A protein has these predicted regions:
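Short secondary-structure capping/junction motifs at helix and strand boundaries
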Residues: 171-173, 182-183
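A gly/proline- and charged-residue-enriched helix-loop-helix capping module
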Residues: 156-172
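N-terminal amphipathic/basic-hydrophobic helices that include classical n-h-c signal peptides
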Residues: 1-12
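N-terminal secretory/targeting leader peptides
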Residues: 10, 15-159, 178, 182-402
C-alpha cells in the first residue's frame, strides 16, 4: 500500500524473486504481516486531534478523556508490606487496563482514619479502601468473622476458597448492603500467615499472665484476650509502638514480622510470642463504592476482579520472602521469639467459644456466616487432612538438613 501524488492510498502488488519471498517469510513471519495489516488499517483511523474512542485508542494507550481514576485509601503506612501489596494491585489494574482505569493510591490517614474509611467509601468521599474488616467491626461484629478466630482448622487458602466458592462473598455483601445499608462492594484476597500472640515485656507462660494486662488488638479478637483477663484498648496500628513506649498499653499484637518492624514494635518490646488463634489467617479486604463499581465497564470490572486474584498469590509469595527475612533480622538483633504455650492456645479456644455464644444470641447474620464457614470446614478439612502432609513439615525438613 502506497500513497499516490493525489494523496490517496492504493494497493500495489510487487512480485519478489523466489529467494526474496522465502527470506521475507523466514525472517518476518506472522508478526511482520500483522504489523503490515495494522499499518494498513491505521489509514482509516481519525486524524491527529480527533476525539479518541472510549476504548483508549490504538495500542491500549488511554486518552485523558477515557481514563477513569479511583481514589482509594489504605489502612497502611507507606513502609508497610501491605502498602506494597496495595501498590502492586494498583499497578496490575493499570497495566491490564492499558491505563483506562487508574488508582490514586493513598496511605493511611490521608483523607480519613481507618475506622471511618468504610463510611468515606459509602459516601463517595473515597472511591475505595484497602484494609481489613476488623477496622470497621463496630458496624456489625459479624464482619470480623472474615479473618478472626481459630479458622476451624482450615488454612488461609481453604478459608479464602469458602469466600469465593462457598458462598462467603454473597453473605458478606448481604450484611454490608442490606443490613448496614452501605453503598459498598467488597473483595477479599491474600490470606495472611498466623499472627503472633503479641509483643510483651516478659515471657507469657500461661493464660493467667494476661490478667490485668492492658492489651491492644482489634475486632472479635478483643473477646479472646478479654476472656483471658486482659483489658483491651483500641489503638491504630501507627500508634501501637508509641502507646507501648508511653505505657498506655502493656502489650500488643499487630500482624507479622515485616509490618511489626515497620511500625517499630521491636524497638519498644523485645519478646515476641509466636503462634496464636486470635487471627489464624486474616484476609485483606478491598471495599469499592458500589455506584462507581456499577458504572465501570464490564471488562474493567473483570480486570479489577482478576487483579485481586493475581494479587492474592503474589501477596502470599511476597509475605513468605519478606517475613522470613525479617524473622532472621529480629533474631539477629536479639529479639526473643518464643512459642506460645499450649495452655494459652487452649485458653484462647475456650474464650472463642464464649465469644461465639455471646455474638450468636442476637445477631442472625453472625450465625448465618458462622454456619456457612462450619459447613465448608466440615467438607474440606477431612479431605485436606486425609490427603496432605501438613506444611510446614518439620519431619521432612529435619530429614533434609540432618
Amino acid at each position: 500500500m502506497v500513497a499516490t501524488r493525489s494523496g490517496k492510498w492504493e494497493v500495489r502488488i510487487v512480485k519478489l524473486p523466489t529467494s526474496s519471498r522465502r527470506g521475507f517469510l523466514k525472517y518476518t513471519g506472522l508478526s511482520a504481516l500483522g504489523a503490515f495489516v495494522t499499518a494498513c488499517l491505521s489509514s482509516n483511523a481519525p486524524a491527529a486531534g480527533s476525539p479518541s474512542p472510549s476504548t483508549g485508542g490504538v495500542g491500549g494507550i488511554a486518552s485523558p478523556a477515557s481514563t477513569i481514576t479511583w481514589k482509594i485509601q489504605s489502612g497502611w503506612a507507606g513502609n508497610d508490606i501491605f502498602q506494597e501489596m496495595f501498590l502492586e494491585w494498583k499497578q496490575m489494574i493499570e497495566d491490564m487496563s492499558g491505563g483506562r482505569l487508574k488508582i490514586d493510591a493513598l496511605p493511611v490517614n490521608t483523607i480519613t482514619n481507618t475506622s471511618d474509611a468504610i463510611d468515606a467509601v459509602h459516601s463517595g468521599t473515597l472511591d475505595g479502601a484497602h484494609h481489613v474488616p476488623a477496622y470497621y467491626y463496630g458496624k456489625d461484629h459479624a464482619v470480623s468473622l472474615m479473618g478472626t478466630g481459630p479458622m476451624m482448622g482450615m488454612s488461609g487458602d481453604m478459608w479464602l476458597a469458602w469466600y469465593w466458592y462457598g458462598g462467603g462473598q454473597a453473605i458478606f455483601d448481604d450484611i454490608m448492603q442490606r443490613k448496614l445499608k452501605l453503598n459498598v462492594v467488597s473483595f477479599f484476597y491474600m490470606p495472611m500467615q498466623t499472627q503472633p500472640l503479641g509483643w510483651f515485656k516478659n515471657e507469657i507462660k500461661g493464660p493467667d499472665d494476661f490478667k490485668g494486662m492492658k492489651f491492644r488488638t482489634v475486632g472479635l479478637a478483643t473477646g479472646i484476650y478479654e476472656g483471658m483477663g486482659a483489658s483491651v484498648i483500641s489503638v491504630p496500628g501507627s500508634q501501637v509502638a508509641s502507646s507501648l513506649d508511653r505505657g498506655l498499653i502493656d502489650a500488643a499484637e499487630f500482624n507479622n514480622t515485616t509490618s511489626d518492624i515497620a511500625y517499630g514494635l521491636p524497638d519498644v518490646r523485645q519478646i515476641l510470642m509466636a503462634k496464636s488463634y486470635h487471627q489464624a489467617s486474616e484476609i485483606l479486604n478491598v471495599s469499592i463504592n458500589k455506584t462507581k463499581w456499577d458504572a465501570l465497564p464490564k471488562d474493567l470490572q473483570a480486570i479489577v476482579k482478576y487483579a485481586t486474584w493475581a494479587g492474592s498469590g503474589s501477596g502470599v509469595w511476597r509475605s513468605i520472602d519478606e517475613n522470613s527475612r525479617d524473622y532472621k533480622k529480629l533474631l539477629d538483633r536479639g529479639i526473643k521469639i518464643i512459642k506460645t504455650p499450649q495452655s494459652v492456645l487452649d485458653a484462647q479456644l475456650k474464650a472463642w467459644d464464649t465469644v461465639v455464644a455471646k455474638e450468636s444470641k442476637d445477631n442472625p447474620e453472625f450465625v448465618k456466616m458462622l454456619d456457612s464457614q462450619r459447613q465448608w470446614a466440615q467438607r474440606v478439612f477431612p479431605w485436606a487432612d486425609a490427603i496432605n502432609i501438613p506444611t510446614p513439615d518439620p519431619v521432612s525438613y529435619k530429614a533434609m538438613f540432618k
